[in-house]
């Protein structure tokens, strides 16, 4: 995955991609399969490959034609799952193919934007794992490119395809909660061995041969150049050069659905806080983190998560008339991953609530975790219909505003102010 685009020259480089790459895009017939490539074949890439294969098994309207990965052992393992697919180390070589319709991007965060932009310029639709990009500036470039090329982009926030958030949106719009003034959520867990401390193959590296070879220079791309570091390669989420830590990995999952439930708008003010309170393994990203954002629609969203305590705040939408209590979406303590929500009236409105509904609280069924497959199916459905997917580029961009600025707030010790277009006023 070689990339010569520097951070400083990112916008100019993105604008010039179309001159270097010939635009193509097949027009799919009713019986045509969506020719799909997977770029990045670590844990998440293999998970998404499985979802694509499930789609193929159920609908037979797609096929995986190409796989790309810089670590040879991962590439070989994935190739065994898809015997007919051609393998690549360089994504640029993969994108020279004339038959591609869709690209699934499952690399570390710092590669999301460069590969997505290159795929869009080739006329491909893109499913990109969350976060949409590594930085807010990159997200603005990507959303502009999606519009310019009239492509489909799905950001990998599975919950945006669940029935849960469509029901929540309907309840919010019905006025049952009154004016929603605050939302809170969490994505917490407790790993005493160190979250993201995935297994390391000590034999793997840039000097190794065969299956153990890693093309470290390509993996680094535009990130700061350094000697090979196995911890950075196998556990990239621990380091700022390749990830935003809890914010980009976990909070993105919570903030995007809140944008669906309320309004999809850029926040007006963002702060991030927390710290590296427990882990002492050389990581840079905090093990406990809070994202807080105010919005032009006059409400606030807070997401508080930890990797060393699983009891995060309850998932709530707090209105002037009632509060909606939702179960945790992912992980957390047993018993909180419920598919049932409760709407409980505020004390001053309890009598009116009882008169209207005939009960002192409303139980909402079927608002739990619907899994991952619906989101991948939504992407392929939209590739064919040309309708906007559930976590489209505009949603991904506006969510990225809150996510990236919370990281910058934490790292720079400042609160960021944003205008309605997403421009950071004091950045």
Model features per residue range: what roles?
Residues 107-109:
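N-terminal glycine-rich "phosphate-gripper" loop used for MgATP/nucleotide binding
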């Amino acid at each position: 995955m070689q990339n010569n685009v520097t951070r400083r020259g990112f916008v100019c480089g993105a604008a010039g991609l179309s001159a270097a790459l010939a635009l193509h895009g097949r027009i799919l017939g009713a019986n045509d399969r969506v020719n799909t490539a997977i770029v990045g074949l670590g844990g998440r890439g293999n998970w998404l490959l499985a979802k694509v294969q499930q789609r193929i098994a159920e609908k037979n309207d797609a096929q995986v034609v190409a796989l790309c990965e810089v670590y040879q052992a991962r590439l070989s393992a994935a190739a065994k799952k898809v015997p007919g697919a051609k393998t690549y180390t360089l994504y640029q070589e993969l994108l020279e193919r004339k038959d591609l319709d869709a690209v699934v991007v499952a690399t570390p965060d710092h590669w999301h934007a460069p590969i997505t932009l290159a795929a869009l310029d080739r006329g491909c639709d893109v499913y990109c794992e969350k976060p949409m990009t590594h930085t807010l500036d990159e997200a603005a470039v990507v959303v502009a490119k999606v519009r310019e090329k009239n492509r489909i982009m799905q950001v990998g926030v599975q919950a945006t395809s669940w029935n849960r958030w469509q029901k929540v949106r309907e309840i919010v719009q019905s006025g049952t909660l009154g004016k929603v003034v605050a939302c809170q959520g969490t994505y917490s867990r407790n790993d005493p061995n160190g979250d993201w401390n995935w297994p390391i193959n000590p034999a793997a590296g840039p000097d190794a041969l065969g299956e153990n070879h890693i093309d470290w220079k390509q993996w680094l791309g535009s990130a700061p150049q350094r000697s090979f570091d196995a911890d950075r390669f196998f556990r990239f989420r621990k380091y700022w050069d390749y990830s935003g830590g809890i914010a980009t990995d976990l909070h993105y999952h919570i903030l995007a659905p809140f944008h669906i439930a309320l309004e999809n708008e850029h926040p007006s003010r963002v702060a991030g806080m927390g710290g590296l309170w427990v882990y002492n393994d050389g990581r840079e990203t905090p093990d406990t983190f809070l994202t807080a954002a105010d919005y032009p629609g006059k409400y606030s969203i807070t997401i508080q998560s930890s990797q060393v305590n699983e009891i995060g705040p309850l998932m709530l939408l707090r209105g002037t008339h009632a509060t909606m209590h939702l179960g945790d979406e992912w992980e957390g303590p047993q018993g909180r991953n419920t598919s049932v929500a409760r709407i409980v009236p505020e004390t001053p409105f309890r009598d009116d609530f009882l008169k209207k509904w005939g009960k002192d609280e409303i139980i909402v069924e079927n608002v739990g975790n619907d899994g991952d497959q619906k989101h991948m199916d939504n992407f392929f459905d939209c590739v064919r219909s040309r309708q906007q997917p559930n976590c489209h580029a505009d949603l991904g961009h506006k969510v990225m505003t809150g996510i990236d600025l919370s990281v910058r707030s934490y790292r720079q010790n400042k609160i960021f102010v944003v205008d309605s277009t997403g421009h950071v006023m004091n950045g």
